[in-house]
C-alpha cells in the first residue's frame, strides 16, 4: 500500500503511569489491590453545560446511555478526594519533576506556570465526571535513532478508575487506579509508515522508562493512535494493547476509511435519499421460525422490527476491515448506544437460522428489499437503536465520520463514541496555578540525564555490537542482563547472546529456559566448567533440579583442561596442518573445548 500517495497522517498519544510515592492530587499510595473492597457506593452522571457554557457531543452520547456506576474502595488506601467529596490536594512534585524531565528530553518548551484543567469524562471512570490534567510543555522536537519526532504536547494527568465488571446498565469500577500519575505525550502528525510509527512509539515509551520513574507491568503503558487519509477523517483509536499491533491497526484503519469512501461514492451514484428512523413490526414473519436468535427474543416477550434502508443493497455487507462489514459498523453503534446485542441486515440473510422464505416475508411487510432487523423487549431501546442506525446511514454519503474507536486484539477497530469537541476542557477551580520552581528544575535535570543513546553507548562499551545493544534495550531482558553482568564474571556479549538468541531458539523447540537454569549456566561458565559452545546443548538437556555442571558431566560436555587441549591440538596440527587445525579441533570436540583455548594452543606450538 502506497501510504504517501494516500496522504496517510498518524499521531500518537502515549500514556505512561509514573512510579511515585503518592497519587497526583491526594496522598493515597498508588497501589492496585485484588482483595475484597471495604465499601461500595453508587453514582449516576447527569449532563450540564461547562463553565464555558457548552455541552460536549461525546458527553451527550454517554449520558444518553442512562448508566449506573458502582465504585469499590478501601478505607486505608482510598480517600475522599477519589470520592469527589474533598477538594484535590496540590499536585505531586515528584510526578511534576518527571514530566518536566521528559519535556527536556524532547526539547519541549516549558510553561512557567501550570494550570490544572478539567477534561470531561463521563464513561464513569472518573467519579467527578472529569479528569484533572496539566499541560506541562509544548512544541518539542528531537532526533532519536534516526527519527525526527515532533512533540505537540506533554501533559501530566490522573489515571482513571479500573473497570472491574459490566452488567447491563451497571458498570463497576475500583478506585485504586484513580488518581495514579500519568504522563501523556502527544506527537505532531507524522507521515511515517505504520512500521516506523511503531518504532517512534517505542522510542517515546522507552525515553520515559529509562528515567526510572515509570511503572512496570501490564496496563502501565497505553497507546492511542490517530489516523487519517486524504478525503477521510481523523479517527482516534484508543487502547492499542501492544506496540507490535500498531502497524496492523493503522493498516486496517486505512482500509476502513478507503472502503467507507467507496461506499459513499456508490451511494451518491445511486442517488440514495434519507433513511427515516421509523420501524415496521415484522414479528409475524417469524411465527414458526427455527432461528435460535429470533426465538430467544420472542420467548422473552420481545418483537422483531425492520428499519427500511432503500438503496443500501449489497453495501450493508460490504467489507470495511478483515472480518468486519459496514453492517458490523452499524451493530457497533447499536451496542454503544443501547443494551441490544446488535442487529441483522438483509445482505447477510438468509442466515442465523432465518430462512429465505422468512426474508421474503420481511421484505414484503417492510416494503423494501434492503433492511435492518432489530430485536428486543424494550420499546425505548428499539427506538433508540433505529435512530442511531438511521443517523449513521444518513452520514454514509458524506464519507468517513470523525470517531473515537477501540482497538480489537486482531488490529481491527470498533466504534466507541463521537470525537470530543472543544467544550470538553475547562479550568479546575479548586487548585491554584503551579509554578515551575528551581527545585523542580533541579530534580528534572537529574532525571533527564538518561537517554537511549546514552544506554546504547554504555552497552557497546561492554563489547556488544550496536545492533545487539538495541535489540537488548527493546527486549524485556535489559534489567536481567545488567543484574547478571554484575553478578557473574562472564563476558557481557555471552550473557546477551544467551538471553536474546539461545533462549529464543530453545523456546521455539518447546524447551523452557528458566532464570534458574540461566543462572546455573552462567555460574558454570564463570567457573570455567563449561564452554560457551556447550551452553545451548546444556540448557536443552538440563533436568529438573539438575545444575548446569551436572548436566554437562552427564552429557560429556565438561570443559577440557588447557593441558589436554594442547595435546589434542599438537596431534591435529601434525595430522592436518596448522591452517586446518582450528576447524578440525572444534569439529571433533565441539562443546568441550573453548575456541580461544584452541587458538592459544595453536599459537604456542612450534615444530
Swiss-Prot record:
Annotated segments matching region Disordered: 399-428
GO BP annotations, alphabetical order: glutaminyl-tRNAGln biosynthesis via transamidation; translation
Keywords: ATP-binding, Ligase, Nucleotide-binding, Protein biosynthesis
Molecular function GO labels: aminoacyl-tRNA ligase activity; ATP binding; glutaminyl-tRNA synthase (glutamine-hydrolyzing) activity
Pfam family of the protein (one): GatB_Yqey
EC number: 6.3.5.-
Top EC group: ligase
InterPro entries given in the database record: Asn/Gln-tRNA_amidoTrfase_suB/E, Asn/Gln-tRNA_Trfase_suB/E_cat, Asn/Gln_amidotransferase, Asn/Gln_tRNA_amidoTrase-B-like, GAD-like_sf, GAD_dom, GatB_C_1, GatE
Reaction equation(s) it catalyzes: L-glutamyl-tRNA(Gln) + L-glutamine + ATP + H2O = L-glutaminyl-tRNA(Gln) + L-glutamate + ADP + phosphate + H(+)
UniProt signal peptide: none
Xref: SMART domains: GatB_Yqey
Domain of life: Archaea
GO CC, any one term: cytoplasm
Annotated family: Belongs to the GatB/GatE family. GatE subfamily.
PANTHER family: GLUTAMYL-TRNA GLN AMIDOTRANSFERASE SUBUNIT B MITOCHONDRIAL AND PROKARYOTIC PET112-RELATED, GLUTAMYL-TRNA(GLN) AMIDOTRANSFERASE SUBUNIT E
Quaternary structure annotation from Swiss-Prot or TrEMBL: Heterodimer of GatD and GatE.
Biological role stated in the UniProt entry: Allows the formation of correctly charged Gln-tRNA(Gln) through the transamidation of misacylated Glu-tRNA(Gln) in organisms which lack glutaminyl-tRNA synthetase. The reaction takes place in the presence of glutamine and ATP through an activated gamma-phospho-Glu-tRNA(Gln). The GatDE system is specific for glutamate and does not act on aspartate.
Cited NCBIfam families: gatE_arch, PRK04028.1
Record-given protein name: Glutamyl-tRNA(Gln) amidotransferase subunit E
Organism the protein comes from: Pyrobaculum neutrophilum (strain DSM 2338 / JCM 9278 / NBRC 100436 / V24Sta) (Thermoproteus neutrophilus)
Gene: gatE
Amino acid at each position: 500500500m502506497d501510504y504517501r500517495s494516500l496522504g496517510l497522517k498518524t499521531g500518537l498519544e502515549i500514556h505512561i503511569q509514573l512510579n511515585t510515592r503518592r497519587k497526583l492530587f491526594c496522598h493515597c499510595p498508588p497501589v492496585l489491590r485484588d482483595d475484597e473492597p471495604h465499601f461500595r457506593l453508587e453514582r449516576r452522571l447527569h449532563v450540564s453545560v461547562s463553565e464555558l457554557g457548552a455541552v460536549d457531543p461525546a458527553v451527550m452520547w454517554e449520558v444518553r446511555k442512562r448508566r449506573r456506576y458502582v465504585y469499590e474502595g478501601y478505607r486505608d488506601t482510598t480517600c475522599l478526594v477519589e470520592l469527589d467529596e474533598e477538594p484535590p490536594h496540590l499536585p505531586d512534585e515528584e510526578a511534576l519533576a518527571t514530566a518536566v524531565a521528559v519535556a527536556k528530553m524532547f526539547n519541549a518548551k516549558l510553561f512557567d506556570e501550570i494550570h490544572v484543567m478539567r477534561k470531561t469524562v463521563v464513561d464513569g471512570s472518573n467519579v467527578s465526571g472529569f479528569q484533572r490534567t496539566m499541560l506541562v510543555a509544548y512544541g518539542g522536537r528531537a532526533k532519536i535513532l534516526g527519527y525526527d519526532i515532533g512533540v505537540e504536547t506533554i501533559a501530566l494527568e490522573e489515571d482513571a478508575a479500573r473497570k472491574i465488571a459490566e452488567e447491563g446498565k451497571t458498570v463497576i469500577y475500583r478506585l485504586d487506579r484513580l488518581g495514579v500519575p500519568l504522563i501523556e505525550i502527544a506527537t505532531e502528525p507524522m507521515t511515517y509508515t505504520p512500521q516506523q510509527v511503531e518504532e517512534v512509539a517505542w522510542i517515546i515509551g522507552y525515553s520515559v522508562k529509562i528515567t526510572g520513574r515509570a511503572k512496570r507491568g501490564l496496563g502501565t503503558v497505553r497507546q492511542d493512535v490517530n489516523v487519517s487519509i486524504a478525503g477521510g477523517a481523523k479517527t482516534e483509536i484508543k487502547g492499542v494493547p501492544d506496540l507490535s499491533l500498531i502497524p496492523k491497526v493503522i493498516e486496517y484503519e486505512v482500509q476502513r476509511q478507503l472502503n467507507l469512501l467507496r461506499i459513499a461514492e456508490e451511494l451518491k451514484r445511486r442517488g440514495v435519499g434519507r433513511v427515516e428512523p421509523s420501524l415496521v413490526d415484522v414479528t409475524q414473519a417469524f411465527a414458526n421460525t427455527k432461528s435460535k436468535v429470533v426465538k430467544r427474543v420472542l420467548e422473552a416477550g420481545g418483537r422483531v422490527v425492520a428499519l427500511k434502508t432503500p438503496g443500501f443493497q449489497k453495501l450493508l455487507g460490504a467489507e470495511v476491515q478483515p472480518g468486519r462489514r459496514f453492517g458490523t459498523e452499524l451493530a457497533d453503534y447499536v451496542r454503544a448506544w443501547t443494551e441490544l446485542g446488535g442487529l441483522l441486515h438483509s445482505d447477510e440473510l438468509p442466515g442465523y437460522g432465518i430462512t429465505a422464505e422468512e426474508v421474503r416475508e420481511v421484505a414484503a411487510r417492510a416494503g423494501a428489499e434492503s433492511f435492518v432487523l432489530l430485536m428486543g423487549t424494550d420499546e425505548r431501546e428499539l427506538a433508540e437503536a433505529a435512530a442511531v442506525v438511521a443517523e449513521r446511514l444518513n452520514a454514509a454519503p458524506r464519507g468517513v465520520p470523525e470517531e473515537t474507536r477501540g482497538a480489537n486484539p486482531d488490529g481491527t477497530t470498533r466504534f466507541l463514541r463521537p470525537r470530543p469537541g472543544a467544550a470538553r476542557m475547562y479550568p479546575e477551580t479548586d487548585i491554584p496555578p503551579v509554578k515551575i520552581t528551581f527545585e523542580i528544575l533541579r530534580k528534572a535535570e537529574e532525571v533527564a540525564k538518561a537517554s537511549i543513546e546514552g544506554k546504547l553507548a554504555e552497552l557497546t562499551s561492554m563489547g556488544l555490537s550496536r545492533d545487539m545493544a538495541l535489540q537488548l534495550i527493546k527486549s524485556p531482558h535489559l534489567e536481567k542482563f545488567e543484574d547478571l553482568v554484575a553478578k557473574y564474571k562472564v563476558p557481557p556479549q555471552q550473557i546477551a547472546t544467551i538471553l536474546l538468541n539461545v533462549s529464543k531458539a530453545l523456546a521455539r523447540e518447546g524447551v523452557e529456559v528458566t532464570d534458574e537454569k540461566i543462572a546455573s549456566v552462567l555460574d558454570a561458565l564463570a567457573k570455567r566448567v563449561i564452554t560457551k559452545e556447550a551452553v545451548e546443548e546444556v540448557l536443552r538437556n538440563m533436568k529438573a533440579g539438575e545444575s548446569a555442571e551436572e548436566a554437562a558431566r552427564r552429557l560429556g560436555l565438561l570443559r577440557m583442561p588447557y593441558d589436554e587441549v594442547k595435546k589434542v591440538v599438537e596431534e591435529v596440527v601434525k595430522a592436518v596442518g596448522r591452517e586446518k587445525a582450528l576447524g578440525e579441533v572444534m569439529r571433533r570436540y565441539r562443546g568441550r573445548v573453548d575456541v580461544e583455548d584452541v587458538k592459544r594452543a595453536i599459537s604456542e606450538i612450534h615444530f
